[in-house]
Amino acid sequence: MALYTMKELLQDAQEKKYGVGFFNTFNTDMVRAVIRAAEECSSPVIIGTAEVLLKYGSFDMIAPVMLEAARRAKVPVAVHLDHGYSYEVIMQALRWGFGSVMYDGTREKDHADNVRNSAQLARTCHAMGVGLECELGSVGGLADDAGKVDQMAYTDPNDARSFIEQTGADFLAVSIGTQHGVYKATPKLDLNRLAEIHAAVDVPLVLHGGSGLSDDDFRNTIAGGIRKVNVYTDIILAAKAAIHADGEEAYADALLRAQDAMKEATAVKLRLFGSAGRA
């Protein structure tokens, strides 16, 4: 099947009001698990990797794996760069032919710098036919190279409107109470804020920090306008549990068990997001 773009997948989700899962990967087993799940569910899906995950393998190793797997898939698959902080990594994704990239400017000290950099990257991406995701506010929970963890800052609906107008970003990641990684307490999502953001902008909204949310949280956020749902930690935890289930088995068998567990965890999310049966 031809390679799809995230813009194509989210446009359909926007029109039909469902969510498309994005799953971060950093090796072949993860890529295979996600695509197996998507094919099993007859669901569109987005795969990709994040700049912070490149410590587990070089971009030039994982990028061709994702792209080739997407082309061979029996369902629509888009390939996306998640949380690109540096110009160099974003340019690598563009060079490899990713259909979309995320620029995360939330670590910029000045909001104006985030706006300026996002607008510049939007012009570059659009000239190449690539979609750009940006984040406004801060979901929090990610650590930088020095180990400092980002703190959460909610997205302001008025700021969201002006940000999209000034930058031309195609997708907006919003902060409404989620956080990356494992939650230490039950998250409290600000659904009223989400509704206000959804009314303020006309681009697909993205939910980061999806792992650990309840089924109702997912249903409510998708009903409130979320069209792309990012998942990573839940998939990793499924693989970890599978590997630890039998410490005596061979390494290769443990990898297969982990892949099956990730596939099942992914399939659960695809059905929950409402994308199953839409391929």
Region annotations inferred by a language model:
Residues I243-A279:
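Extended, intrinsically disordered, low-complexity segments
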Residues Y4-K16, N27-L53, D60-P76, G84-A200, ...:
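Alpha/beta enzyme core
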Residues H208-S211:
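Glycine-rich beta-strand-to-loop/alpha-helix junction loops that act as flexible
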